[in-house]
A protein has these predicted regions:
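Active-site neighborhoods and metal-handling regions in enzymes and metal-associated proteins
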Residues: 1-175
Length: 175
């Protein structure tokens, strides 16, 4: 269901649209699927989505005055509740034509996610995931945000375990 929401928003991304408009379109789509936006009013958060543009890291509040422009990159963090279960996923998109450097950032970031997923197998340790992400990203010279981490999800939006995207010295729990 969340992928349907992401696809709807991806199709709407264009120069001239505001992040507020994307938020309202996404909320309408979530509700049309019989779901509830799980970010809206979460710890006082005033929107259904976190929509960050360019160098904003995450959790930016949609705004009528924040207009997307050709060459921007926009990250949409979306979540919904369906039959008491939460989902949460972020996607980053190009707004029109972007620079090769911006495209490389999107590509490396996306692939780092899949490198981590490859390590999420029985017998490995939790932080094998973290280290795989760091191993992939570091040679490209990109920094990794250490204040935010991946997390479990289910009956609550944020559940254990926490999964850092940066290198860990310890192994973590066995999967």
């Amino acid at each position: 269901l969340l992928e349907i929401v992401h696809k709807e928003l991806e199709e709407a991304i264009r120069p001239g649209i505001s992040t507020w408009e994307l938020d309202h379109l996404g909320e309408k789509t979530i509700r049309s699927l019989g779901c509830i936006p799980n970010f809206l009013n979460y710890n006082g958060y005033p929107a259904s989505f976190c929509i960050s543009v360019n160098d904003e890291v995450v959790h930016s509040i949609p705004n009528k005055h924040k207009i997307l422009h050709e060459g921007d990159i926009v990250s949409i963090d979306a979540g919904l509740i369906y039959k008491g279960m939460h989902s949460d996923a972020a996607r980053t998109h190009a707004v029109g034509q972007i620079t090769p450097e911006a495209q490389k950032l999107i590509d490396v970031t996306r692939q780092s996610f899949f490198e981590g997923i490859k390590k999420a197998v029985a017998g490995n340790h939790l932080f094998d995931i973290s280290n795989a992400i760091a191993d992939y990203v570091e040679p490209f010279g990109y920094g990794i945000v250490e204040e935010l981490v991946g997390h479990g999800i289910g009956h609550a939006l944020h559940e254990d375990p926490q999964i850092p995207n940066f290198r860990q010295k310890r192994k973590g729990i066995r999967l």
